[in-house]
Amino acid sequence: MRSSRHGRSNERSIMKAVFLVGIVLVVSFLIFFNIGKLSSTAAERVRDVSQSAVQQQDKRPFTQPAQQKQSDGKPKGKVVYLTFDDGPSSLTGQFLDVLQEYNVKATFFMQGSNLKNTGYQDNVKRAVEEGHYVGAHSMTHDAIKLYDNKQFVPEMLETLHLIRNITGTNPKLTRPPYGSAPGLKEEQIRDQIADAGIKIWDWTIDSYDWKLKDNPNKIVENVKEQTTEDLEVVLMHEKPQTLQVLPEIIEFYKEKGYEFAVYRDEEHFRLNFQKDNRL
């Protein structure tokens, strides 16, 4: 009888041990499963945060690295500024596409009457977001109003205000329609410009693209013939013929070893036909 009772006691002990081992295994599995799940969740959260940070960074306006300067404030080396007047237009987005494809930044001078067109404003915002500069080209592009009637400063301030409202930037640079010569030859109007804190930029190369609708190759020829200095500022317009040859113009400057630059208010240098250092 003792042997039988002793055997049954051993069986119960073994069963208890097996049961306890089973519980330990189940608990261990649950612990490791939850730890793995928590680790996976944490990793996903880290990945989501990282992706969000990258997306936010992508939305920040492009910042051009500061360039080395000469004593007159102009950049050193072979530098070209591509500039486009008379936008925004139905072509602005396509110009931005080409510039994006070539990773080139440009400077746009936009007209107030066009900026008021809400259908164009998304591309104005896009231009700034992608690192381009948007300056003013007056409200009316009317030489009599701007120069004879002395409305240059009021129109430019109004245009700059529109740009600020659309993009959130605070540009100071303007381009006088038809250039500062002869438009700004009177010192009185230049005094008004200086007092208003407005800056002026003309150009070093005139592509004459606006009158070459049926001869786009001549635009490229004009640009090539006039490219003679290390620093060049090319005047172009938002025209179909210009869009057509823009890749060729970009390739030309790349082959010549030019760096593409975009205007920055804090790095302004004098570039006006009147040679007025205040502007």
Model-found features: residue ranges?
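Catalytic domains of cell-wall/extracellular-matrix polysaccharide-remodeling enzymes
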Residues: 141-254, 258-259, 265-266, 273-278
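Detector for Asparagine
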Residues: 10, 34, 39, 48, ...
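Active-site beta->alpha N-cap acidic-glycine motif
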Residues: 53-147, 151-165
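Terminal accessory/targeting
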Residues: 1-81, 97-106, 230-279
